Amino acid sequence: MSFNTFIQHIKSEKYCQLGFWKLSEIGIPCNPIHWFQFADDAAVISSQEKENQMLLNRFTIWCQWANMIICVDKCSTFGIKKHLTKSMQYLPKLFVNNDLVPRTEMGKSFRYLGRYFDFNMSDEEHKSELLDVFNDIMNKINELPLHPKNKILLYSRYLLSKISWEFTVSDISKTWICETLDSIATKYIRKWLELPVSATLSNVLLPQNKFGLNIILPSTKFIQCQTVSRSALKYSPNVDINNLWAVTSTNKNIQYDIYKDTKDVLKAVRKENEQRLQNHLISQGSFFSSIMNHSTSTFNSLWSSVQSKLPKNIFNFTIRYINNTLPTRKNLSKWGLSSTSDCSFCSSPETLLHVIAGCKTYLDEGRFTWRHDSVLNFLASTLTAVKNSTLYADIPSFMNPSVITGDRLRPDLLLVTENRCLYILELTVGYESNLLVNANRKRQKYSDLINEQEADYDKVKFVNLSLSTLGVFGRSCENFDGMLSSLKCDAKYSKYIKKQIVNICIRTSYYVFCKRNKVWDNPKLMLI
């Protein structure tokens, strides 16, 4: 309030004349004086030293009256004058209480409100400081014994926030940010997620509801900060500030003026990553393309919630699974780390699909059946709690569905409720690209059985639970929610059931992958 009082004081008509001081007898034109005040930081810009000194004297007198101390050692002066036809830096002589205000050395800069100013108006000090701070903090985060998701959280919440003011006030080019800070960030992110150099980060830059990690690179944060700065100029109530926006709406600023706000920036960047995954990165974008076309979007946020609670090794497994950079023999051969790309059991190319859901030898050994039955066992154990119902499941320790359906067609699970409603649940756990194919195949397979059972029950409902090996729910699973609701499972319990299904799928697929090219030991069904 004290500083505001002083500002109002020097804005009065008497002292406004200082801003246009004129020696009419010798014909010196009007010279503008500008006073900038922000909290306890002040800056005075004038055309002549004596004008500046006059305003400083007034400020000094006012501070003495207010019993406030001016720390001269914390002040600085910076001077530019015209010599012949060129402008040059010089050392001005301005005093406060007869003490010479420290002068900015020739070729050096001073800092005001976070922005460095020098004679050349370069951003070298900003770049140097940003680089030092960024490297230092990223290195400290890297050394912390934290889960990768927590390291990414520190990077996103702390580091990007810390450098956002520098991004806002400086004129650093976006190119420098991309080539320098983005490179450092991606290097550490790859390290934390155990991603090879060849892996794309387009997946992890997506939002969590699209199976990404919601990571923002420094260049994106920079565009957001510049957008905020430009928007403040454009919509300022001050006409002069609006004019400043109009004058500077050229060259590099055009790329920031196209955005309405920071959300608009994120939307554009993520759209670009999605297009890259769908149209250019065929191998690493196959997962994204499949789930965008065939998954149940309302269930996708649950997947990210489960992923965030996984231990480091399985968490990183899901990331590398999504962008297809797990060490399969096909990838190892591509990277020059393996002499063969073939599976040691069946001699087919060992791709991710082959290891996770495609190898015929693995299928015959029961690896994929073990994963399927682990999910089914959880479902059956959970649904036995439904009151006044009878459950049949095609796994040991439960009544077999063949009691009702016979041996020709045997669904994974049958549930008969007290109101004579028969739920026929068929579970499929396959590769993401086969979500729709598996669902259609099972629907056709059991269509006759459904018609047959309608003669014996008041209602027959088919629940086509088509899941991916990483726990993604296919679109055919939408009626699974309806089934849980009909069985009087509240929203919280339904969410728990779906999360556990995702959890089991991810963990069993991780185990199947780790046992590739190894003897299968027929483990017990996974319990969580």
Identify the residue ranges that each predicted region occupies.
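Conserved pre-motif C helix in the palm subdomain of viral-like polymerases
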Residues: M1-L18, L159
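Extended C-terminal regions of large enzymes
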Residues: F167, W176, T180-D182, Y188, ...
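Short, conserved micro-motifs composed of acidic
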Residues: I69-K108
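Active-site metal-binding core of divalent-cation-utilizing nuclease and nuclease-like domains
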Residues: S333-L337, T382-E426
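Short Cys/His-based metal-binding microdomains
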Residues: K334-T382
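Catalytic palm subdomain of template-directed nucleic-acid polymerases
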Residues: I33-W65, K81-T85, M121, Y362, ...
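Basic, alpha-helical interaction scaffolds
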Residues: F95-I172, V228-N242
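Conserved catalytic cores of phosphodiester-cleaving nucleases, focusing on short active-site segments
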Residues: L379, P411-L415, N419-S433, Q444-E452, ...
